[in-house]
């Protein structure tokens, strides 16, 4: 599947609704992935990546507040078993990585090779040589204080 969508959002609430729709798409896929589905989040600081993931996590009934794991780099959230065959949602923020190999020491290969995981990666360009070509690219463009352009390209 190779599809693209473009949205203009006027608020963080609209951004979260688009993200929730994407997570519902993954839930309906019934986990037919050979490896973890990966969401590549691209955009400048403050462009809406973390806000998007807050909306994304709602459909998976994740109760923890989603915040950017800039200093911890990787955060794992359990997905309730009755909801999905997915078990974990990983939020990875590569912004502060000193070098690309640092991510391997944190278990990236195991995380992305497990089809029971869903993985969202901020700043994926910093570790692109370790990532698969297929995935869901979400690009954020800051237009004004609350307005964003969000382009989603699904290539799974």
Each language-model region and where it sits:
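Short phosphate-coordinating micro-motif centered on Lys-Gly-acidic
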Residues: 1-5, 99-103, 108-156
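Phosphate-binding P-loop
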Residues: 2, 25-36
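N-terminal pre-Walker A segment at the start of P-loop NTPase domains
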Residues: 1-25
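Hydrophobic anchor at the beta1->P-loop junction of P-loop NTPases
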Residues: 39-41
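Short beta-strand-centered segment that lines the nucleotide-binding/catalytic pocket of NTP-utilizing
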Residues: 62-77
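The conserved Walker
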Residues: 45
């Amino acid at each position: 599947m190779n599809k693209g969508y473009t949205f203009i959002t006027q608020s963080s609430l609209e951004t979260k609704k688009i993200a929730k729709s994407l997570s519902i798409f993954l839930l309906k896929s019934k986990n037919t992935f050979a490896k973890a589905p990966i969401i590549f989040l691209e955009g400048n600081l403050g462009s809406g990546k973390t806000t998007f993931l807050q909306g994304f996590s709602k459909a998976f009934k994740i109760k923890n507040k989603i915040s950017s794991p800039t200093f911890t780099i990787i955060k794992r959230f359990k997905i309730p078993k009755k909801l999905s065959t997915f078990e974990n949602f990983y939020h990875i923020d590569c912004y502060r990585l000193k070098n690309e190999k640092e991510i391997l020491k944190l278990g990236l290969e195991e995380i992305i090779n497990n089809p029971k995981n869903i993985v969202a990666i901020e700043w994926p360009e910093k570790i692109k040589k370790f990532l698969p070509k297929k995935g869901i690219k979400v690009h954020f463009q800051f237009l004004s204080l609350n307005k964003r352009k969000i382009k989603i390209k699904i290539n799974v």
